[in-house]
């Protein structure tokens, strides 16, 4: 894990500030491009079905880190942009494991995604089902 953090020490203050400015520009462009047309963006929470618990724990530490990186790639971007998001259950995979969708809102508009998530759960029953253990 330390080996993955050490390269960050090589980033200069100038490069860090430039990257922060670039992130701010991408964030503005994303927000303007998406939220000028919709109130909420709906996307998968993770890009592939969840593994079994045994599969999730298998492999080396690097394997687990890579797996978590794959799973978080759709939520990580939204977090980087600082947007509010809520994941709600929307079904089960063919293996019987839960699948989620994320509701993504405008900056500081948590109320809208919470209302939408609540409304979704009132008309579906996915949040009441549990996978077999």
Language-model regions: role of each:
Residues 88, 97-106, 113-114:
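Short, well-ordered beta-strand elements
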Residues 1-28, 44-48, 87-97:
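Short helix-loop capping/hinge segments that flank enzyme active sites or metal/cofactor-binding pockets
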